């Protein structure tokens, strides 16, 4: 299924019972809904628990449009895509689970449109994320040399999937980003769960992020890094318990 989000065609999927509580799932950078949430059995887990899953392919990813202009990937625009999807479906609000880039998008939705989201799970996110090496990642996506291991990891991950447009991904990582603002984070009132692998060396200072959000609690998944935390049983169990309130 598709909808128009401020002139950009975005792909989304619906799964689970029509009567289920809606949960929007937003994937990480260079991934897409199916890779992030289906192969890792998140869709199966959530629909099995009775939720109505709304899976979005972010702009520049999956089956959605892939602009090559970094301005098209401003964080506020990508957060706006979530709000416009909720409007398109006429559901008012939804729970939210995002990973890595998807978590950063969810955090921005909390700041810009807090009434669109209910309970929010932010996975693979910290104070910095990968954006401090954005220029290196963009160079890697364009096949240019880089000494950044993080950039090389993302490049190898991205190029393994033919659906990816590496120039669009370079533009995405260079899109305008709003820095973390402790004052704004302190205004969040939605319940928030932050989940990271305890071996994640990409996200930065997760404790600083959690301490800045009054409603946040933190779960660390033992033995998992940024790439391996998504399918972890402990992550799913923590999310289900949290969403149930």
Describe the predicted segments one by one.
Residues 224-236:
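Catalytic histidine-centered segment of alpha/beta-hydrolase-like enzymes
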């Amino acid at each position: 299924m598709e909808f128009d989000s401020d002139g950009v065609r975005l792909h989304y999927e619906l799964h689970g019972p029509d009567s289920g509580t809606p949960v929007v799932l937003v994937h990480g950078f260079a991934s897409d809904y199916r890779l992030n949430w289906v192969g890792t059995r998140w869709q199966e887990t959530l629909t099995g628990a009775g939720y109505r899953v709304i899976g979005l392919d972010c702009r520049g990813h999956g089956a959605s449009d892939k602009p090559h202009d970094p301005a098209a990937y401003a964080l506020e625009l990508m957060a706006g895509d979530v709000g416009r999807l909720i409007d398109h479906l006429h559901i008012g609000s939804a729970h939210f689970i995002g990973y890595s880039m998807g978590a950063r998008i969810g955090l921005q939705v909390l700041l810009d449109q807090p009434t669109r989201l209910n309970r929010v799970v932010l996975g693979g996110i910290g104070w910095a994320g990968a954006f401090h090496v954005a220029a290196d990642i963009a160079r890697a996506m364009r096949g240019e040399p880089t000494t950044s291991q993080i950039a090389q990891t993302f490049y190898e991950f991205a190029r393994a999937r033919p659906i990816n447009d590496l120039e669009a991904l370079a533009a995405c990582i260079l899109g305008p980003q709003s820095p973390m603002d402790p004052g704004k984070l302190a205004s969040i009132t939605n319940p928030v769960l932050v989940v990271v692998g305890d071996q994640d060396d990409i996200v930065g200072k997760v404790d600083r992020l959690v301490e800045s959000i009054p409603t946040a609690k933190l779960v660390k998944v033992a033995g998992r890094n940024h790439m391996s935390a998504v399918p972890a049983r402990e992550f799913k169990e923590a999310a289900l318990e949290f969403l149930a309130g």
